Amino acid sequence: MNEPVEREEYRPSGTDLAPKLRDQEVGRTVVSARIPLSRAVLVAYAGASGDHNPIHWNERFARAVGLDDVIAHGMLSMGSVLARITEWAADPGAIVDCRTRFTAPVVVADAASGTPDTPTAYLDMAAVVGAIDEEAGTVRLDISVSSGEDTVLGRTQAKVRLA
């Protein structure tokens, strides 16, 4: 029988490593990350999500419908951002609300090397404490997400419960 494997990234809520509500300050950046995207990531996400729209994997089709190239799934972008927030909170159930607007597509070009797992696009994100609700035990994170010069997720916020 296989023994369970403990992932280093996971820190159960309540550990000394989990952020505490009392330590948060409005205006503080709590997460900053660069998230790589490749064609292989898009295909894997399509398989996991069931979203097999060819704009996410077929360059010829994407261009035929007016796009510059293959684009990332919007929910892949949002999910990747929220995964970083979950890691920071050290609790997979800490996000109690989230919202965003998809403002621009994330083009994921074919790698010049021809290797599909080579990243050709990046999501740059920063999460800043926008508000603290001590009574509810939550912080509101205001999150900026861009790819190159484009803001790709707008008005993005997550409400996170902290101990």
Annotate each predicted stretch with a short phrase:
Residues 3-72:
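Catalytic strand-loop segment that frames the active site of acyl-thioester-processing enzymes
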Residues 65-69, 77-126:
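Hydrophobic beta-strand-centered segment that forms part of the acyl-chain substrate-binding groove
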Residues 34-38, 101, 159-161:
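Generic structural detector for well-ordered beta-strands
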Residues 1-30, 112-163:
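HotDog/MaoC-like acyl-thioester-processing domains
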Residues 39-40, 62, 78, 86, ...:
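Generic secondary-structure boundary signal with a strong preference for alpha-helix termini
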Residues 56-61, 95-97, 136, 150-152:
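Glycine-rich loops and low-complexity Gly/Arg-rich segments
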